[in-house]
């Protein structure tokens, strides 16, 4: 479907030298995509829930921080959040609570110890109406406030499961589409791209995940 592949990541995604290099390559490609006005707020999404989008989002945020770029990882997958669990954060308030006015950033932002400097905004209390929350002006305002001082990586829902991801992408600088090298079909890719194009969401490119090292 003509999508530019910005990086290929193998099956082993944590601590592995080759994986670290892949996400560093992704960081560089994104930062130099438009040197005069690089994307500040990036939606990371996928066709299906198990394609590895949350792993890619987390590793991209980590790569940015390791390169000296202040970054915030935001869990906007309000139906199936994983960021808090991945980073060992306690259950509590997060993005949804900020958007509805129950909490402020000072209450919900967490700073990672490893890597030091990565800021994490978990999903928070799961709302009954995720789509309405993610299409609200307050969601956009919250993300833009974070982007004043940090690059923002938004872990969004999968495109073909719910409408949330394509809606989120319209409000941010662009979407990064994660594809599973082992399972994503051409039809799924086509439908995902069409979902983004229907709402005029900019597509930054694709990440091919779970690539067998023998195939590289």
Predicted regions and their residues:
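Hydrophobic anchor at the start of a short beta-strand
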Residues: 71, 152, 175, 203-204
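Short, well-ordered coil/turn residues at beta-beta hairpins
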Residues: 46, 122, 155-156, 178, ...
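Short, flexible helix-loop junctions that flank or precede catalytic/ligand sites
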Residues: 111-112
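Switch II (G3) loop of P-loop NTPases
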Residues: 71-74, 94-100, 105, 120-167
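Conserved Switch II/interswitch segment of TRAFAC-class P-loop GTPases
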Residues: 155-161, 172-190
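Short, conserved active-site loop motifs that form the nucleotide-linked donor/cofactor pocket
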Residues: 117-118, 204
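Short, structured coil segments at secondary-structure junctions
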Residues: 171-172, 199
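Short boundary/hinge segments that flank catalytic cores
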Residues: 1-70, 76-96, 102, 106-107, ...
